[in-house]
Amino acid sequence: MSAIEKLFPTSPQERSFQMKARRDAGTAAPNWVPPQFVECKKCGRRATRQVWVKSQYVCPNCGVHLAIGAYYRLSTVLDHGTFKELNPDIAPNDVLHFPDYQEKLAAASVKTGLKEAAVTAIGRIGGVQAVVAVLDSRFFMGSMSTAVGEKITRAIEYAADKHLPLIIFSASGGARMQEGIFSLMQMAKTSAALERFNRSGGLYISVLTHPTTGGVTASFASLGDITLAEPGALIGFAGPRVIEQTIEIGRASCR
């Protein structure tokens, strides 16, 4: 243990959280080596990962917000040392025995270090205690499964029970097709929980990040008392590709 760690001891959960945040940011790599340079997907600017971490993955050239991992986002939002994860053991369930779903879940978990696309936590922001939920687009495109719906619902209910403000960072491609109707049911489940939270006088801040679409947009992402969004984020019910395939018109024809 270093001299600094002796002066400012941290809990095992906090150390685990910081390790996960560094992994998400690309500054710690236990099993893989991240690229030395990261390129902005909008303007093409290339910079070292350290430069991007300092700017919290906001392009200094064009201002676009790059996607970031759930634990890294929580580390940038919550006061140091106040993170406590809620319901970390909730994991997806292959209720329909969908072909290759278990294998894809395992691969996504290895790639991201996550059990599911949502991470929920309690912590302080500027000294104010709050419940924060983050969807991570790296895990099944942040799609809403029964496990994601359960974690979001429990976070809402925890905020209501403790009379705490609630903040949800959304990033999703919609409902998870591998779970069929069970995934779609989460739209009503989370919306009903938010209605009860609203009636109890709770404050809900919804933050829409790129992209937020489908069933998440049609449920809890659109129900905030205050709604914020990243500049240039894709927000809608259907993405461009789905619209193009439905009406059989390319993007170029619409301009």
Where do the model's predicted regions map?
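Long, charge-rich boundary regions
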Residues: 68-142
